[in-house]
């Protein structure tokens, strides 16, 4: 039998601020966002697993926790490296006991634009730049190039996860406005930077041979 998610929580008293230890724990858990990926709800299970420590501290009422877990199992599809941005906003709303319909709407609004932004930031910018810095080492036959690539990439993406969690949790819904108003400009700038770097790599490492026959 389907569970009917209530519009309001039973306990409407705002919860205390989450401590940094809990926020950092959820940053680590966000790495498992796609561990239970499926085509019915995409990343929903991984999302709930990641945000659950915060929900358990916010909702001391068991029925409220049940309702929160239920609506946090809604369909979700966002960029895995930027998911903590959405987590921080949702946790801020949960802490202030916003209506469940509001939380669900904000979650969708925040998660949507992150796909394009994340692709531009990581796959079109960070990866080409990191590859450019380490390719020369790898081309000399040193395994250090591959190791440095993995270290730089993973340190960068985890630093972004950590910063976004703390930043968006502090801003709350204001972060959504900032995201939607600047999403196109940010994506365009990141894409241009990535293309510029790829062009530089081609100029440095690419070679082309032309055979010209006259007469």
Give each language-model segment a name:
Residues 98-106, 209-215:
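Hydrophobic alpha-helical transmembrane segments and immediately flanking/interface helices
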Residues 72-73, 112, 150-155:
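Transmembrane helix-bundle signature of multi-pass membrane transporters/permeases
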Residues 137-215:
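Membrane-embedded alpha-helical modules
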Residues 35-38, 117-121, 186-190:
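Hydrophobic alpha-helical transmembrane segments of multi-pass membrane proteins
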Residues 105-136:
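Transmembrane alpha-helical segments and their cytosolic interface motifs
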Residues 18, 22, 104, 108-116, ...:
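Membrane-helix interfacial "entry" motifs
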Residues 1-102:
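Soluble N-terminal domains of membrane-associated systems
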